[in-house]
Amino acid sequence: MALLQISEPGDSPAPHQRKLAVGIDLGTTNSLVAAVRSSVPEVLADAQGQVLLPSAVRYLDGGAVRIGREALLEQARDPLNTIVSVKRFMGRSAADALASGAPYEFVDAPGMVRLRTVQGDLSPVEVSAQILAVLRQRAEDVLGDDLVGAVITVPAYFDDAQRQATRDAARLAGLNVLRLLNEPTAAAIAYGLDQAAEGIYAVYDLGGGTFDISILRLTQGVFEVIATGGDTALGGDDFDSAIVAHACAGEDVAALPVADRRALLVAARAAREALTDQAQAPFEVTLRDGRAIQATLTRAQFEQLAEPLVGRTLESARRALRDAGLAVGDVRGVVMVGGATRMPVVRQQVGALFGTEPLTNLDPDQVVALGAALQANLLAGNRPPGEDWLLLDVIPLSLGLETMGGLVERIIPRNSTIPVARAQEFTTFKDGQTAMSVHVVQGERDLVSDCRSLARFELRGIPPMVAGAARIRVTFQVDADGLLSVTAREQSTGVEAAVAVKPSYGLSDDEIARMLADSVTQADSDARARMLREQQVEARQLVESVGAALAADGDLLDPAERATVDQRLQAAAQAQSLDDVEAVRAAVQALSDATEEFAARRMDRSIRAALAGRKLDELA
């Protein structure tokens, strides 16, 4: 007997009706769009049959814009107005962009760098939107209808500012963002669904301008990212730069005109790609001054040039394994993603590290877009019966806030799966305190000064109470796109303040790696520093409370007792600035001992005052 699926009136979908959603791989070098058609994900081609859209935009006088291959044709002749690898500048400052050495004229602007062109100063968001608009139009032309939304992939290490910039670019392009998805996770979706793989896998993603390594646990219906690492400034472009430096030995490449430098990089990329299948490749460029630079690059020479760059990726892989508490032998397989993984030297060294042949049966240029298409199809509500899986990503660095003494209270630890929400209660430090400053930080160290500041805001309207009586609940929430919001709420009145964290510029992977390394090498000194700060805060609190008590009830002490308390109060006040934790602790203990009897007398006085004039039956 057949089973019928019964829906509520009005909720039953029309036969064959599907919502059109796409997956977009917005890459540094190339971008793609894919969709699920007849239950199979496929990359969509343009009218010429090309699936890869070069991530290049050229701006011309008069307002015309060329995108993709048309833009690349004039790249060497018009480098300042032909923007490539714009993904590197998403959510970055002018200082970051200048440090990249890219051949553009950068303009510092609030929030994000801008690039100077003949059509004015443009942000990376606006440039990326041009690329996304072409992909949206291609998808609508091929699929024959409007899109309900798109899943757009980003490097796993993109921070809040870079992710927000990507969302902004999509909106400018007329796209509804269903979700931002980490590129390695998208690859895991593609391989996991196609092969029903289970176990621990590494996703090695080396694209044109970024590198990501993710360690994933694939089990029945669940994809969980358990550790991530990478470098947002390492990719195929850097291998090209190494070839240029080799071929132009003795030449001051940085002093050459922009057009010459661009031509050299184009020739280097052609040589690198040729060496994938050939033993040697020519490198020939004629500079604008008429000089010819000619060389023949062998695969052995290229492997020698590439070794330090590949070595950096392997060190990131080892670090990610350590973060996950795994050994190399625990990894069942390695998924290769990104066009740069076609280089034989990359596949050989990755295979040697993990002791297994890397998985390359899906096109490394397309695998991310295919996985994004599967996720988009799911989010659009087109999931077929039985296809029910869960996806979990992680945050790369712990999130917390500053407490008294400049200490960090971690709210969400690093490698927590997202989306995630955590809350913790805090209280006031001083009597009558009506406002609280909330300082949100990111990092693994114990002191605020050693962590990265993300945002500050104030909660006002706290009812005046004695210190420690107010209850302020602080909630940290990280959504599925890795964006953070923080809310502080006073429990008795409901007064609330919040902030959405969008840093003015991104945090590089080198900085993340340094922060993680420092948290290990400085663990002992951090523990000592935290202990000292905690004692200093305790001393400050005790000094202030004893001072207030003396002002209110000092008459409860005789002259000798008062002299002892005053002496120890002064000693504790001076101890706050000491760097000796034992000395601070001793001063606090001495003051506590000296005021113990005083505290008891104050309690007695308070009780007598409360009971004065009351009858016994009123207390029953």
UniProtKB/Swiss-Prot annotation:
GO molecular function, one term: ATP-dependent protein folding chaperone
UniProt keyword list: ATP-binding, Chaperone, Nucleotide-binding
One of the GO BP terms on file: iron-sulfur cluster assembly
Cited InterPro entries: ATPase_NBD (IPR043129), Heat_shock_70_CS (IPR018181), HSP70_C_sf (IPR029048), HSP70_peptide-bd_sf (IPR029047), Hsp_70_fam (IPR013126), ISC_FeS_clus_asmbl_HscA (IPR010236)
Membrane found in the keyword field: no
Origin superkingdom: Bacteria
Family membership noted in the UniProt record: Belongs to the heat shock protein 70 family.
PANTHER family: HEAT SHOCK PROTEIN 70KDA
Stored HAMAP family: HscA (MF_00679)
Biological role: Chaperone involved in the maturation of iron-sulfur cluster-containing proteins. Has a low intrinsic ATPase activity which is markedly stimulated by HscB.
The protein's name: Chaperone protein HscA homolog
